[in-house]
């Protein structure tokens, strides 16, 4: 149980911008991270939902609510997922061979496809967040990060690993 709790704090420190007490890496708890990822999603979803309730409580304009709902998940994750989205958009948009796309993923420079993808993503989120600002579906804000992280965990657990992935190594 202690290792699972430590894995949760490790997961939060990696995938969330909320400060946590975990400062050390435990190699043996690495595989438990996949189980903890949906819990971090729940934490982010609750923050997102509470922010939406506060916006409605204070009667903020629909555009401001859209802006808040669009930006909260980025700030809660420390922009980690936006950075990853931009890297993948850049690699896929390059239409290059697999080896070159892997190089693009590792490159720290931002390419044109990354910028275009980022702008479209943020505009899309803003439009949908603004449209849903006074909707009864706001409770889904809790579920969306949980489901996305469940899918991510399942993908890491089931899909073939890249040779450079830490999960490609055999368990000790």
Describe these PLM feature segments:
Residues 1-78, 93-102, 107-108, 113-172:
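Hydrophobic alpha-helical transmembrane segments
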């Amino acid at each position: 149980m202690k290792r699972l709790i430590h894995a949760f704090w490790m997961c939060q420190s990696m995938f969330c911008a909320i400060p946590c007490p975990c400062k050390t890496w435990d190699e043996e708890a690495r595989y438990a991270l996949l189980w903890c990822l949906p819990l971090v999603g729940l934490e982010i979803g609750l923050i997102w939902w509470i922010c939406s309730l506060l916006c409605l409580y204070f009667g903020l304009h629909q555009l401001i609510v859209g802006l808040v709902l669009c930006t909260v998940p980025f700030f809660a994750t420390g922009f980690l997922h936006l950075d990853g989205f931009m890297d993948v958009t850049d690699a896929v948009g390059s239409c290059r061979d697999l080896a070159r796309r892997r190089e693009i993923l590792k490159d720290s420079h931002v390419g044109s496809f990354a910028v275009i993808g980022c702008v479209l993503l943020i505009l899309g989120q803003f439009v949908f967040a603004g449209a849903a600002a006074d909707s009864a579906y706001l409770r889904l804000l809790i579920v969306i990060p949980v489901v996305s992280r469940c899918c991510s965990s399942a993908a890491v657990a089931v899909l073939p690993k890249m040779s450079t992935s830490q999960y490609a190594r055999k368990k000790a």
